């Protein structure tokens, strides 16, 4: 059995005497597993390189992942039963709590669970542009998948999530990461989806 404790490391907390939550926690079952097996530290990519969930898992299971790298969106899409066709773009999403200025209050919306399905249903099929079909599905807890179907789409766009460790706490504008018109179009579509989704979800009874 190969146990991956993704994200469990955390950071030291002053209220815990400078310990991380894991160091301060009572973990008898984890301790037992380690005593019966083996544990250690490793640099998944290289010394000093912080990796995300997708990169870390791919590196652990596929030594050739640098040549076979798939972004997280397509993997999340398959996880909820959506299989992509050529030219379609899948994005891994979070339900998040924001204020009226798009300042992020909670990147995971309180780790919402069953209610996420109702929220996702209200966004599925959203009309953001002629010739573009929107598929939106809830995944585990606060996670969701956005699939854009249509012509002239590109995966070469930036993220709207500043991330946990960022000094920025506002939803970021999605920008093209290439000069291709398809990337510019896709970035505009995703920004439009975010704006429309905010208008719909802020009035949602959930």
PLM regions: where:
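Conserved structured core elements
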Residues: 2, 23-27, 191
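Aromatic-enriched hydrophobic runs in primary sequence
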Residues: 6, 33-36, 137, 189
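Active-site nucleophile/metal-coordination loop of metallo-enzymes that catalyze phosphate/sulfate
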Residues: 9-125
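Short, flexible coil/turn micro-motifs enriched in small/turn-prone residues
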Residues: 2-4, 43, 158
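Beta-strand elements within well-structured catalytic alpha/beta cores of enzymes
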Residues: 1-11, 33, 193-196, 206
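A contiguous, mid-domain pocket- or channel-lining segment that forms the substrate-recognition surface
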Residues: 72, 76-200
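Beta-sheet entry/capping signal
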Residues: 1, 39, 143-145
